[in-house]
Amino acid sequence: MKTVIVITGHGNYATGLKSSIELLAGQNGDLYYLDLMVNDTDQMLKEQMTNVVKKNKGSSVLFICDILGGTPFKVSVEIANNSDHMEVVAGCNIGSILEGVFQKDKISVRELADSMVSSSKRTTVRFETVNKNTVIDPEEGI
């Protein structure tokens, strides 16, 4: 089953990610970017999301939201709540979203959601400086 991805969030979150995703992975007609701007209502966002779902009838849908518990998340959950072919995730980083874009038609939407959450956890790190006297083997890379 084909999977479409809806990226949504506050302000220009979604369209900002669109710029990065298209730079790194190219354009993809199965990705939708829905911003919730200051004068938008939850009902307006719900209508946009519902239109994407209707346009892609028969496809699985993964909603990627900026913040757990925010309006885009709540609206996504409301739409996905009664469907076995829709999932909602929140707080994923660009690396995990890119992984999801490349995996989306190879695994189920549930596996995709789980994979993206795991990837975000695994790739969120804090850089630690290396002792200046430590010799680093250039063959090891960064």
Positions of the model-derived regions?
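N-terminal loops that bind phosphate or other acidic moieties
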Residues: 2-64, 68-142
